[in-house]
Amino acid sequence: MEFKGAYTALVTPFKDNQIDEEKFREHIEWQINQGIYGLVPCGTTGESATMSHEEHKQAIKICIDQNNGRVPILAGTGSNNTSEAIALTRFAKEAGVDGALSITPYYNKPTQAGLKAHFKAIAREAPLPTVVYNVPGRTGVNLLPETLAEIKKEIPEVVGVKEASGNISQVSQAVEYCGRDFSVLAGEDFIVLPLMSQGGKGVISVVSNIAPSKMAGLCSAYLSKDVDKALDLHFDLAPLCRAMFFETNPIPVKTALSIMGRMDLELRLPLVNMQPENESKLKQVLKQKQLI
């Protein structure tokens, strides 16, 4: 399966420390109606690090049910514990997702050989089309393009990478070494257009939580070779992309959705509400972009 276009790294709405199912379903429905290509529950933006395994399963089930087969679902199933990643991937496969988003093990700091062994074990025990997630700033380990090419060759289940190293040269090497049939997806909203210009397929996006039609439109424009329109949308989205990282993701995006009236603001510790001066700056950008 080829994953391409704009996928939303879904926030997880909470209410009284439980998943707010009503708001989660509303958010999923709005995303689909706005033209998003696909959905990614239980990623970093979904606060997966503070969700129990039962909550992971609940969020994935809700997403599958509400989506009802309309767009692909790429479920976050990664862990720094290989056996946990296998169990979550096995559940997601049995539940009926289209693929898994599997982060490189964090904190452990495995070697490149360890990364390969991790993804091989998951594929062997729970085979499912998989996009590996490389985000060195959060994990402390960088999945190198050379290793990624070996993984693609040795593990057919790995069909793509969410590349969030922030290194556009590394993105280019990923496409060069893995081939144009491999789904190299941006893990950072501000590099979507540069990545696609080098053969990347799209993005797993934070900002599409609040501007799904624009991010989907950017990807569609580039895929249809309308570079001018893609460039216009790139610059149109740029202030929002910056605003989503005024503080640690997903604090700004959940705050924005709250300000927009789409859900209540509830974060899980150790994440806390935005500092007042940053929230004020965020509101200014939302007003500028006519989202409030």
Feature-to-residue mapping (PLM):
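Short helix-capping segments at alpha-helix termini
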Residues: 65-71, 94-96, 126-128, 153-157, ...
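A general structural signal for well-ordered alpha-helical segments in protein cores
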Residues: 24, 56, 60, 85, ...
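C-terminal alpha-helical cap/extension of soluble enzyme domains
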Residues: 2-13, 34-36, 197, 204-292
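Short amphipathic alpha-helical/adjacent loop interface patches that line ligand
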Residues: 28, 60, 119, 155, ...
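Alpha-helix N-cap/helix-start motif
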Residues: 49, 85, 111-115, 141-144, ...
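Catalytic alpha/beta core domains of metabolic enzymes, predominantly
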Residues: 124, 138-242
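Active-site beta->alpha loop and helix N-cap motifs at the rims of alpha/beta catalytic domains
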Residues: 1-8, 12-15, 19-140, 150
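Glycine-rich phosphate-binding "P-loop"
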Residues: 134-135, 157, 268-269
